[in-house]
Regions:
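Non-catalytic substrate-recognition and accessory regions of acyl/acetyltransferase enzymes
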Residues: 1-92, 108-113, 120-131, 135-170
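Glycine-rich acyl-CoA binding loop
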Residues: 91-106
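Generic non-transmembrane alpha-helix signal with a bias for helix starts/N-cap capping motifs
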Residues: 99, 117-119
Length: 170
């Protein structure tokens, strides 16, 4: 991200959904990996990570609204329960990390816990301070439709929380 100036924006449900639909179109093999936000819940806050190249002005062709610039990733948080969901990055190289920015923003809005499969996401979330508080064996009955068993195996399902949060105590 060193070539970019980035910022976190609060966005509307419609803007978040548009980004999510774009992600699902570009990444059909991951289309069922990102949670849809609950419908009609006033406790949901949507965020987007957007950026621009440092050496140029905010490009006018993307419009005055920052969400119209380079969309790098998004997430949502339920401010009443602390649940963080729908974290994704756009079609960026694997080495471009957006999760730290998104998780810092969701934590600032009251996010304290999330779910994932054991593996790279667990490692990413652990670097942001989340610890595993519950672990369940992989269950094919609940596996995403697009799950690739040959590549992804059958990792445990995890609930991770920030230490000291209500979810961490269980």
């Amino acid at each position: 991200m060193s070539d970019f100036d980035v910022t976190i924006c609060i966005v509307t449900q419609g803007q978040y959904t548009a980004m999510l639909n774009e992600f699902r179109t570009i990444n059909p093999n991951l289309r069922d990996r990102v949670d849809d936000p609950p419908v009609d819940d006033d406790n949901i806050k949507y965020i987007a990570l957007v950026g621009k190249f440092k050496w140029g002005p905010w490009p006018p062709l993307f419009g005055p609204n920052p969400v119209e610039n380079f969309r790098l990733g998004a997430a949502w948080v339920n401010t009443s329960t602390g649940y963080i969901g729908g974290v994704f990055k756009t079609n960026l190289p694997a080495n471009v990390q957006v999760a730290p920015f998104l998780l810092d923003a969701t934590k600032a809005l009251g996010g304290t816990w999330l779910e994932c499969f054991d593996g790279k996401l667990r490692e990413t979330y652990a670097k942001q301070g989340f610890v595993t508080v519950a672990r369940s064996p992989f269950n094919r009955e609940y596996a995403p439709e697009t799950w690739n068993y040959d590549v992804e195996g059958e990792p445990d399902y995890l609930v991770m929380a920030l230490p000291g949060s209500p979810t961490h105590k269980y």
